[in-house]
Amino acid sequence: TSVMFDGSSFSFKENIRRTKKIVALAHKYHVSVEAELGAIAGIEDFVSVADRDAHLTDPKQAIEFVRATGCDALAIAIGTKHGAYKYTGDSILDFGRLKEIAECVDVPLVLHGASGIPSSIKKICTDYGCEISNAKGVSDAAVRKAVTLGVRKVNVDTDLRLAFDAGIRKFLKERPEVIDPREILKT
């Protein structure tokens, strides 16, 4: 069992204070805590972070943050983005920053906003009415490289949402007579 706390919208000191409090409570119950340092651009849970407001994780702050909070895993910002429209060109991740952080902290690193937007899922979505033709995600090669450099957990929520959306849209097109949500969700 684990908790993910994203205090990245707070100041560095406030993020430490809040994360430390959550870690203390969670650890009483043997629950691990993933914390976030650095702001990832894009839209997540109806919260939008503009590219200009996103900032990459500072390796020196990562050291201080992990030591001060006692978090069990650290989600870092190295250039990924939340949502389906991450990039207009190829994904550009700061692998040097990732390597530096991995070398100086002793907790697993997490990559948020790492969905790849697979073309196979994108095609099903667009074939059945979803308007995501310009969606572009993190490349498989970039994710593989991040893992070789120290990332131990990769979050791909947008890919899961798109796969769900594709399946539902396809089912409803092929079986328009079905109106029971329980039947739809069984597929």
Sequence positions of predicted segments:
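Alpha/beta enzyme core
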Residues: T1-P108, G116-K136, D140-T148, R169
